[in-house]
Amino acid sequence: MALSNSTTVLPFLASLWQETDEPGGNMSADLARRSQLRDDSKLEALYILMVLGFFGFFTLGIMLSYIRSKKLEHSHDPFNVYIESDAWQEKGKALFQARVLESFRACYAIENQAAVEQPATHLPELKPLS
């Protein structure tokens, strides 16, 4: 059975506290300074909690409004009804096909008549310098 060794920590902490404390310092001034620091730290903690609270409140509000705006099940808005229908997709396909056909009609090739009329003529080439 292992015995707890919690009593050995207390002398170590006491000696550590005495080393960090100023020797010959004014004890009442030191206590006043420490109490003032404790009051300030309470206000700092309150300030941090308030900032986090406001941030959380605004974040929650933005998140809920975003979620609410994405619910389209009960929306009878004409735009949402139009998006849910397939009519716009059919119109989009027809418009895409018309544009493709129009672009094919606008494309044409220009041929070099001199090259077509003389297919047996040898074209000059640059000979590599070796």
Swiss-Prot record:
MF (Gene Ontology): delayed rectifier potassium channel activity; potassium channel regulator activity; transmembrane transporter binding
Record PTM: Phosphorylation inhibits the potassium current.
Query: What membrane topology does this protein have?
Result: Single-pass type I membrane protein
Taken from the UniProt entry, a GO cellular component term is: voltage-gated potassium channel complex
Instruction: Using the UniProt annotation, give the residues that carry a glycan (glycosylation sites).
Output: N5, N26
Record keywords, A-Z: Cell membrane, Glycoprotein, Ion channel, Ion transport, Membrane, Phosphoprotein, Potassium, Potassium channel, Potassium transport, Transmembrane, Transmembrane helix, Transport, Voltage-gated channel
Membrane-crossing segments per the record: 45-67
Which of the residues are on side Cytoplasmic?
68-130
Q: Which residues carry this modification: Phosphoserine?
A: S103
Q: What is the annotated localization of this protein?
A: Cell membrane; Apical cell membrane; Membrane raft
Origin superkingdom: Eukaryota
Which is one Pfam family of this protein?
ISK_Channel
Q: Which residues form a coiled coil?
A: none
- GO BP annotation list: membrane repolarization during action potential; negative regulation of delayed rectifier potassium channel activity; potassium ion export across plasma membrane; regulation of heart rate by cardiac conduction; regulation of ventricular cardiac muscle cell membrane repolarization; ventricular cardiac muscle cell action potential
Family, as annotated: Belongs to the potassium channel KCNE family.
Describe its partners and assembly state.
Interacts with KCNB1. Interacts with KCNC2. Associates with KCNH2/HERG. Interacts with KCNQ1; targets the complex KCNQ1-KCNE1 to the membrane raft.
Function, as annotated, reads: Ancillary protein that functions as a regulatory subunit of the voltage-gated potassium (Kv) channel complex composed of pore-forming and potassium-conducting alpha subunits and of regulatory beta subunits. KCNE1 beta subunit modulates the gating kinetics and enhances stability of the channel complex. Alters the gating of the delayed rectifier Kv channel containing KCNB1 alpha subunit. Associates with KCNQ1/KVLQT1 alpha subunit to form the slowly activating delayed rectifier cardiac potassium (IKs) channel responsible for ventricular muscle action potential repolarization.
Q: This chain belongs to which protein, by name?
A: Potassium voltage-gated channel subfamily E member 1
Q: Which gene encodes it?
A: KCNE1
